[in-house]
A protein has these predicted regions:
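Sec-exported extracytoplasmic/periplasmic mature domains
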Residues: 85-93
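Short secondary-structure boundary motifs at beta->alpha junctions and helix caps
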Residues: 63-70, 153-227
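Surface-exposed short loop/turn segments
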Residues: 104-165, 170, 254-260
Length: 260
């Protein structure tokens, strides 16, 4: 029964891909982003910050922030929406605000409500040996986490879902040299994050969210079709669709996560 069910899942998923062509998606985003500074070097209780007055403290925090205080909400949201719309076309689905008094969510009329986006900036430490075994260095890097909460509808029932992704600095190269006193000095070449890089990341998110939304509706269709036929449905065999290779495959973690 399980093998038969797995085969049936893919069959119904391919059916969904065909039947969903021309579907209309109404996509909504929040008016603004929530921004949270979690950098440990910006904690006002740090010994180097607690002695500062309010103005000095704010100036110091602003100087240490890499991304958070530079984000233009409108730019971030607009590039994400445009990317979402373009990605939908790859699935033969269109962005269209179809809602009216005569139309409700159904198999060809979907709502993707991205109700909340939180962007956090924090510090990480990456451990590297810098090419000398036994000599390990902690390298300070910055991570920007983008967490998003969704409400998805293709019938009268709402589903609430979540996903998060990181925009990270990473080590390009790390090596030791010697100073004038013959002491080892660590040299680290970081791939730095930037505000332009974050907007490029928003483009990636728009494409990802379009794919995740399509996949959710596809799996919802598969679940309902199996239930009609009294076939077993396994949450562990979540399906994704690649519109470029026209291929359906299994995943465990690369998806929207339902919030109970």
């Amino acid at each position: 029964m399980i093998l038969s069910s797995c085969a049936s899942q893919k069959k119904f998923a391919y059916d969904f891909v065909k039947k969903s062509k021309g579907a209309k998606v109404a996509f909504y985003v929040p008016n603004e982003l929530k921004k949270t500074n979690l950098r440990i070097d910006c904690n006002p209780q740090n010994v180097d910050l607690v002695v500062l007055d309010d103005e000095e403290l704010q100036d110091t925090i602003n100087s240490r922030l890499r991304i958070l205080n530079k984000i233009d909400d409108e730019i971030f949201l607009n590039v994400m929406i445009m990317s979402f719309e373009e990605a939908l076309k790859d699935y033969d689905v269109n962005l269209q605000y179809w809602e009216n008094e005569n139309t409700t969510p159904d198999s060809l009329h979907w709502v993707v409500d991205l109700s909340h986006i939180e962007i956090q900036e924090l510090v990480n430490y990456q451990l590297t040996n810098c090419e000398i075994e036994g000599n390990y260095e902690f390298v300070k890097t910055t991570t920007v986490n983008v967490a998003s909460w969704f409400e998805l509808l293709n019938d009268n029932n709402s589903s609430f879902l979540f996903t998060e992704q990181n925009y990270d600095e990473y080590i390009n190269d790390c090596y030791y040299s010697k100073d004038s006193l013959n002491n080892l000095v660590v040299n680290v070449d970081l791939h730095h994050i930037s505000i332009d890089g974050l907007y490029d990341f928003a483009v990636m998110l728009g494409k990802l969210y379009a794919g995740y939304s399509f996949d959710y509706f596809m799996n919802d269709y598969v679940r309902k079709e199996l239930k009609k036929r009294d076939l077993e449905y396994s949450e562990d065999t979540y399906l994704r669709y690649d519109p470029y290779e026209m291929y359906i495959y299994y995943t465990r973690n690369d998806k929207l996560v339902e919030i109970n």
